[in-house]
């Protein structure tokens, strides 16, 4: 074998090795590029999911705050309306004694007290109602600015509060409870 052939074989061998090295390098770079792309896609998907979850959480928080604020506005408006009705009802109560139905109402309250507490029960009527209440078995005192009666059994164990202001407070409280219960549904 001549020197030229040996040199040519060496050059061919080097050329083959260069091609192998280039091919291996290209394969390694392609593999690294594919791994890089896969990692980027994985990170992107992870952050997109985190952003979706955070967006959902923020949206839910905004909706909750809006609902709370809307309910607060509604409660305030209802309270305002109720106050208007309470004022109107109190105005009517202030003048209930002047109504033609009041003597019959007062006598009905006395009948109810005697029916449930006994004929010998103690009945207190406001002094201002002396003219419209029957006089037998009735005690007169300042029990309520609007009228009504306070009654108790003879032994004092059972009391019946039929004062107009007490009844009105009770009714208003029940109305408020019903309204707020419906709001919470």
Curated annotation (Swiss-Prot):
Task: List the GO terms this entry assigns under cellular component, sorted alphabetically.
Answer: plasma membrane; proton-transporting two-sector ATPase complex, catalytic domain
Tree of life domain: Archaea
Q: Where in the cell is it found?
A: Cell membrane
Q: Which InterPro entries does the annotation name?
A: ATPase_E_C, ATPase_V1_Esu
Q: Does the keyword Ion transport apply?
A: yes
One GO biological process term is: proton motive force-driven plasma membrane ATP synthesis
Name the Gene Ontology molecular function terms of this record: ATP binding; proton-transporting ATP synthase activity, rotational mechanism; proton-transporting ATPase activity, rotational mechanism
Keywords assigned: ATP synthesis, Cell membrane, Hydrogen ion transport, Ion transport, Membrane, Transport
Q: How does it sit in the membrane?
A: Peripheral membrane protein
Function comment: Component of the A-type ATP synthase that produces ATP from ADP in the presence of a proton gradient across the membrane.
Q: How does it assemble?
A: Has multiple subunits with at least A(3), B(3), C, D, E, F, H, I and proteolipid K(x).
Family in the record: Belongs to the V-ATPase E subunit family.
Task: Report the protein name in the record.
Answer: A-type ATP synthase subunit E
Q: Which organism is it from?
A: Thermoplasma volcanium (strain ATCC 51530 / DSM 4299 / JCM 9571 / NBRC 15438 / GSS1)
Gene from which this protein is expressed: atpE
